[in-house]
């Protein structure tokens, strides 16, 4: 199988242990930070006046990620038009080498137009909330200019 016995990399094992300890001790704090930012993001999107649909039941989604479709905006055009100031995605990492409709969104029963306008926005626990909102405001302005 190509696996041979050898010396365990002690530094890597210790690093993994510390990462696990931090993940456990900071979990609740990180979840609260994610949710606070998600509420602010959803509020801004709602007040923006763009026509959108959230993809997926938010009760079962990660608190640091939103997948939404902006009606009348091609996700590829939005992604390319906003790459100077923010990073959004319109597909999954496992299909990044070629553009094809998201198999997850397809399996969820979304139609082709909704899938082609879907973007994923995510943030970390330490993402600055004001910076996130400012960049999202810019993204919304670009989206409004791309509506067809």
Regions found by a protein language model. Give the residues of each.
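Pyridoxal 5′-phosphate
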Residues: 1-148
């Amino acid at each position: 199988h190509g696996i041979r016995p050898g010396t365990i990399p002690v530094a890597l094992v210790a690093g993994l242990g510390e990462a696990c300890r931090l993940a456990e001790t900071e979990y609740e704090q990180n979840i609260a930070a994610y949710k606070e930012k998600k509420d602010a993001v959803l509020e801004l999107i709602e007040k923006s006046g763009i026509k959108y649909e959230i993809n997926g039941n938010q009760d079962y989604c990660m608190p640091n990620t939103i997948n939404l479709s902006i009606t009348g905006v091609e996700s590829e055009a939005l992604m390319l038009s906003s790459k100077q100031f923010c990073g959004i995605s319109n597909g999954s990492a496992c299909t990044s080498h070629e553009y094809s409709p998201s198999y997850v969104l397809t399996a969820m029963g979304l139609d082709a137009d909704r899938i082609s306008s879907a973007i994923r926005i995510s943030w970390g626990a330490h993402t600055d909330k004001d910076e996130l909102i400012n960049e999202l405001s810019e993204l919304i302005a670009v989206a409004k200019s791309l509506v067809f």
